[in-house]
Amino acid sequence: MENDQFLQKQHFLILGLAKSGYAAASILHEKGIYVAVNDQKPFEENEPAQKLSEKGIEVVCGEHPVSLFDQHQITILIKNPGIPYENIMVQEAEKRGIPVWTEIELAYYLTSAKFIGITGSNGKTTTTTLIYEMLKADSQKALIAGNIGTVASEVAYHADGDEWIVTELSSFQLMGTHAFRPEISLILNVFDAHLDYHHTRENYEKAKQKVYLHQTASDKAIVNQDDETVVRLAEAGKAEIVPFSVSKTLEQGAYVKDSMIMFNGEAILPLEEVVLPGAHNLENILAAIAVVKTAGASNEAVKKVLTSFTGVKHRLQYVTTVNGRKFYNDSKATNILATSKALSAFDKPVILLAGGLDRGNGFDDLKPYMKHVKAVLTFGQTAPKLEKLGNELGIQHVKRVDNVEQAVSAAFALSNEGDVILLSPACASWDQFKTFEERGDMFIDAVHMLK
């Protein structure tokens, strides 16, 4: 009630009309709250802007006029997470002392439902999905939202107070939170990522830390004891810490002992019964268990999911086998750590398809994981760097192609029966695609064309 009264007094400006901006504007308008919209794309080419205009919302397209702040007496700016803080409208808001939100903050204000906030440099989507499936298997009321594809404000707006909103959170989204308080929060891991956006490692860490910062002593922070950065970031919060560890035997929390997955000293199931592929997924599994056991889930619910859940699309997803060659779609691998984990999952010869947006980093950190790689097909802005890497390692076949489709056919031509053909780009997709999903779907389509 208090949150709703706060919202009713505000004048909002929505900056950027992707899914989250459109949803935020629509919800605020429906609630009778003052809202205006600004988007770079020209109005005549902008279907979401046209739809909002038809609802009676003021929409300004094609430019970013700072006069909108005075014209509409704006008190809060909600920006698309991907819009950089260097944007003129964001800079103007900060100059005026106007709070800059992402729609995650709005989602928090729209509901009395309980949030589970999941962030990390890698593994977010798999872990978020595991948590959601485990809560459902336990017959708890759960919704899934955030960076996983479902707009959080939309989910929150329609949520009941007794539901869990299992929310995948990017650093971009968390930067625009100021009061957002999950009852259960999780940072899976932290390493250098998105430094083109955050500029420094410190800024990136501060964004991730926001998932812990506003929690109270009655909340729970799920903490990866194997990641020194996560342990340090959790210390700034007030929540009770629930640990998990892949490498240590713990007195409480989630861990592995004698090939058995444990929680608080109680055996849940043998590791060999888990069907999710890839050693790297153990971190995601233990984190998910720590979350759902904290939320009161039964061991039976956890077991039911772990003995049936085989993974998420675009995350080391098995596609098919063609003439003895196994194809895997790991398009979600938008950084080096994700690709190194994918490569670690195979002990058979691998043909690696990689490349994408150039964020200025090198790829030397991949070298220790390339021992099974027999060929590299590169594409996108980073193709020259990955080509250089392959040549330095003395990989027999290193070839630059124009796109994912060409990479698939070239990889198949170079392959033998028993080989793994792996799309794991180690780069974001935005140089050639709108999303990593689009890139993964193109890979899947190209693979099926081989049959």
From Swiss-Prot:
Biological or metabolic pathway of the protein: Cell wall biogenesis; peptidoglycan biosynthesis
The protein's predominant localisation is cytoplasm
Please provide, alphabetically and separated by semicolons, the GO molecular function terms listed in this UniProt record. ATP binding; UDP-N-acetylmuramoylalanine-D-glutamate ligase activity
Q: Where in the cell is it found?
A: Cytoplasm
Q: Which reaction does it catalyse?
A: UDP-N-acetyl-alpha-D-muramoyl-L-alanine + D-glutamate + ATP = UDP-N-acetyl-alpha-D-muramoyl-L-alanyl-D-glutamate + ADP + phosphate + H(+)
Write down the top EC class of this protein.
Answer: ligase
Q: A GO BP term, please?
A: cell wall organization
Signal sequence segment? none
**What GO cellular component is one of the record's annotations?**
cytoplasm
Which Enzyme Commission numbers does its entry carry?
A: 6.3.2.9
| Assigned keywords, A-Z | ATP-binding, Cell cycle, Cell division, Cell shape, Cell wall biogenesis/degradation, Cytoplasm, Ligase, Nucleotide-binding, Peptidoglycan synthesis
Binding residues for ATP: G120, S121, N122, G123, K124, T125, T126
Family membership: Belongs to the MurCDEF family.
Quote the NCBIfam families the UniProt record gives: murD
**What is the protein name stated in its UniProt record?**
UDP-N-acetylmuramoylalanine--D-glutamate ligase
